[in-house]
From Swiss-Prot:
This is Nicotinate phosphoribosyltransferase 2. Catalyzes the synthesis of beta-nicotinate D-ribonucleotide from nicotinate and 5-phospho-D-ribose 1-phosphate at the expense of ATP. Keywords: Ligase, Phosphoprotein, Pyridine nucleotide biosynthesis. The lineage of its organism: Bacteria, Pseudomonadati, Pseudomonadota, Gammaproteobacteria, Pseudomonadales. Pathway: Cofactor biosynthesis; NAD(+) biosynthesis; nicotinate D-ribonucleotide from nicotinate: step 1/1. The keyword Glycoprotein does not apply. Transiently phosphorylated on a His residue during the reaction cycle. Phosphorylation strongly increases the affinity for substrates and increases the rate of nicotinate D-ribonucleotide production. Dephosphorylation regenerates the low-affinity form of the enzyme, leading to product release.
Length: 398
């Protein structure tokens, strides 16, 4: 009998999350322990999720019972930039359901988070994985792990046919597939398959639990929330990106040096990304807009600053599949180092399955609105049109 795609648990433990949530959480503990934030769920493809509300609430109750184990803490202790006080804090951490509101409003499912940033930050990824798997259990109950493995093997076969041995030797790819995965069981099977048989260079996973279980490197630095929160954490709005980068540098002293460019827009980011930051950070991550236009812009910026682009890395993570990644790799080969983070294309690709397009984004910090504009208009998010208008004015965004 074929192995079901679904196991009893959806979220396995506290480490079943993206690594950058932990790196940001440590920075919040050390720098902004009293910051208050609000988050809002959004389903970009307008799917009706009301039917799944009871199951989602049941999973929230399960989350509240999770505690990190001594073995998991020991794994984190081996990561040199995670500080002892942060490890101790994680040992005490519990998900608190009082910070989560769910229900139906205007005939639509809603989910909101409100509370201390330090205690809310870890909710995002498991919530998204829960909602995705609850919906998939209802819509695709007969799905099997073998279907995911077969799709993965087809992709490997395609890459072997299309790419030369020389190209494969430098084609670096990581799993970024936790938040919109079809199910945990599929996710584990996919990452195991990538480790064992990926034709290029599989460099690790963003999922901390799977990194520990499968002896892989956990990957990730910062997300949009880090830059968004700084819009209301004290500095002048025009200085918020610089303040976010500077705080990151002080926290990690040159480690975890991949910065995200599109919180406002890449043009606005590069105006703040001066020689100081460009030397300190190892590279940049692309998450919206045309990837090759973005790459040309960032390469030109490094050259203008007198920095050899071949000493820097560009990470691409915006809705990638292998054909898109290979196209980008070929266009930039020999000009700058590149790496790819692929998510849904690997972890939610089964026959007949339509992946969800869901996000949980920060909407306010310390009682005031924050915004993400991005290089793709459809990815913009802000609940206050006046604030986003002001933000565009301050950063000279059309």
């Amino acid at each position: 009998m074929a192995e079901s795609a679904f196991s009893e648990r959806i979220v396995q433990n506290l480490l079943d999350t993206d690594f950058y949530k932990l790196t940001m959480m440590q920075a919040v503990l050390h720098n902004y322990p009293n910051a208050e934030v609000e988050w809002e769920f959004r389903c970009r493809n307008q799917e009706d999720l009301r039917l799944y509300l009871p199951a989602i609430r049941e999973q929230l109750e399960y989350l509240a019972g999770l505690a990190i184990s001594d073995e998991q803490l020991a794994f984190l202790e081996r990561i040199p930039f995670l500080a002892p006080d942060f490890i101790r804090f994680l040992g005490l951490f519990r998900f608190n359901p009082r910070y989560v509101q769910t229900g139906i409003e205007n005939d639509e499912f809603f989910l909101r988070l409100k509370g201390p940033w330090l205690h809310v930050i870890l909710f995002e990824v498991p919530l998204l994985a829960m909602i995705s798997e609850v919906r998939n259990r209802a819509r695709y109950p007969a799905a099997t792990v073998e279907q995911a493995r077969e799709r993965l093997q087809e992709k490997f076969d395609w890459l072997r046919r299309e790419a030369s041995a020389e190209e494969l030797a430098g084609f670096k790819m990581a799993d970024f597939g936790t938040r919109r995965r079809f199910s945990y069981r599929v996710h584990e099977a996919v990452v195991s398959g990538l480790k064992e048989d990926f034709p290029g260079c599989f460099v690790g996973t963003s999922n901390v639990h799977l990194a520990r279980k499968l002896d892989l490197k956990p990957l990730g630095t910062m997300a949009h929330e880090w830059l968004m929160a700084h819009q209301q954490l004290g500095p002048r709005l025009i200085d918020s990106q610089s303040a976010a980068l500077d705080c990151w540098v002080r926290e990690y002293r040159g480690l975890l040096g991949i910065a995200l460019t599109d919180c406002i827009t890449t043009d606005a980011f590069l105006r703040d990304f001066d020689l100081y930051f460009a030397k300190l950070f190892d590279g940049l991550r692309h998450d919206s807009g045309d990837p090759l236009l973005w790459a040309e812009k960032t390469i030109a910026h490094y050259l203008k600053l007198g920095i050899d682009p071949l000493t820097k890395t560009l990470v691409f993570s915006d809705g990638l599949d292998l054909p898109r990644a290979l196209k980008i790799y070929r266009a930039l080969q020999g000009r700058i180092n590149v790496s790819f983070g692929i998510g849904t294309h690997f972890t939610c690709d089964l026959p007949g399955v339509e992946p969800m397009n869901i996000v949980v984004k920060m909407s306010a910090c310390n009682g005031h609105p924050v915004a993400k504009i991005s290089d793709t208009p459809g990815k913009a998010q802000c609940r206050d049109p006046d604030f986003i208008h002001y933000l565009k004015h301050v950063f000279q965004v059309a």
